[in-house]
């Protein structure tokens, strides 16, 4: 409804139905083989210029971590959601958001293997090598490209895998840990800027407070605790001890490697398990040392993103290859080769509206499965 001239307007009893100048007709005759079809929407991001080495890293290094970690989280969340309608209401959006990319990574890997994307890329790279070798100027610019890509990605594989475990099992899964991470960031700021203490009402505490209040609106302690326990076990099993920092190894040894007991202790002795506890604890000024006496804050501060970034940088320095920079060179080279061949090209669909069109037809999603009748 809008105003008398058909323009958008606030609610009024005098509003009238808006009649658009043009409309799309919706067919009610069903969908049949050979029908024209069109899809329009935002694809998020695509990576159509990835090298075979970059595809291999995604398929064999990062996607397996994402799939396993998120599947473990989802299984725990679903069990709690099925047992309690209130938890289902609180966690439905979280569950969808986590499962969305978990399913994406799972089916991406299935399709990468099914269509042998690494093999397709490698075959194109063989053509690229011949194209580079055919011209002295291209040899001078790109002669070491493919060898550098292989060396660079192989050198950084373990550092990338560990960083992915850090992202998927440490900083993201638990709301309590996310609150603790914010306290860790607060401690870093206090130490950097010479802030003696922080309490509720200070501008330095405002971000922690507002983010915790927003996050804890949809929070179940038992669910979060079980998720954190499982994710911490996964982190400890897959990330070497030298990446844990100082406080986490001390707590882990104190509880003799019993992660559930460690998490029980941390949850019982932290201010991060509720908005009310957080505000009550910061009702009086807290020094950086006092904040780090909180076991959750201590663990969050112990495992630093900087350590993972430094390990990745060290891998690059040891190999003498920055894989990301080589990937950019590869993008230029493959684009130039395709252009010289007259191959039509288009940019990656990064946050742009894209149109896909064609005709309806059968599909074979898996071996020995053939679907000829369109889904209605």
What does each model-identified segment do?
Residues 41-43, 360:
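Short, surface-exposed secondary-structure boundary micro-motifs
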Residues 207-210, 214-367:
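N-terminal activation segment of mature serine protease catalytic domains
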Residues 58-283:
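Cationic-aromatic interfacial patches
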Residues 30-31:
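Short, well-ordered loop/turn sites that connect or cap secondary structure elements
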Residues 44-54:
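Short, Lys/Arg- and Gly-enriched loop/turn segments at beta-strand edges
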Residues 13-22, 355:
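Short, structured beta-strand/loop micro-motifs enriched in basic residues and often containing a Trp
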Residues 369-375:
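Residue-level detector of conserved catalytic or cofactor/ligand-binding positions
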């Amino acid at each position: 409804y809008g105003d008398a001239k058909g323009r958008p307007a606030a609610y009024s009893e005098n509003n009238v139905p808006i009649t658009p100048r043009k409309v799309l007709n919706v067919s009610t005759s069903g969908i049949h083989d050979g029908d024209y079809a069109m899809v329009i929407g935002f694809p998020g991001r695509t990576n159509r210029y990835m090298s075979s080495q970059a595809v291999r890293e995604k398929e064999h290094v990062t996607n397996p971590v994402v799939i396993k970690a998120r599947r473990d989280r989802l299984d725990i969340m679903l069990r709690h959601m099925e047992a309690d309608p209130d938890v289902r209401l609180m966690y439905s959006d979280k569950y969808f958001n986590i499962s969305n990319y978990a399913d994406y990574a799972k089916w991406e890997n299935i399709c990468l293997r099914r269509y042998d994307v690494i093999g397709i890329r490698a075959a194109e790279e063989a053509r690229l090598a011949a194209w580079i070798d055919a011209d002295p100027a291209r040899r001078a610019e790109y002669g070491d490209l493919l060898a550098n890509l292989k060396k660079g990605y192989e050198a950084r594989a373990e550092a990338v895998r560990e960083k992915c475990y850090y992202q998927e099992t440490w900083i993201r899964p638990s709301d309590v840990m996310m609150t603790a991470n914010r306290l860790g960031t607060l401690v870093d700021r206090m130490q950097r800027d010479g802030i003696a203490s922080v309490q509720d009402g200070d501008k330095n505490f405002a971000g922690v407070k507002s983010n915790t209040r927003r996050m804890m609106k949809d929070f179940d302690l038992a669910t979060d605790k079980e998720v954190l326990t499982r994710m911490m076990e996964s982190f400890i099993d897959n990330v070497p001890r030298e990446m844990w920092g100082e406080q986490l190894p001390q707590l882990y040894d104190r509880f003799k490697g019993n992660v559930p007991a460690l998490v029980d202790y941390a949850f019982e002795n932290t201010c991060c398990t509720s908005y009310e506890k957080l505000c009550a604890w910061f009702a009086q000024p807290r020094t950086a040392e006092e904040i780090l006496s909180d076991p959750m804050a201590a663990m969050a501060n112990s495992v630093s993103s900087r350590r993972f970034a430094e390990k990745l940088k060290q891998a690059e320095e040891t190999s003498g290859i920055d894989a990301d920079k080589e990937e950019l060179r590869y993008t230029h080279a493959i684009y130039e080769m395709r252009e010289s061949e007259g191959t039509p090209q288009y940019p990656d669909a990064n946050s742009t509206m894209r149109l896909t069109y064609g005709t309806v037809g059968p599909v074979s999603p898996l071996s020995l499965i053939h679907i000829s009748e369109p889904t209605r």
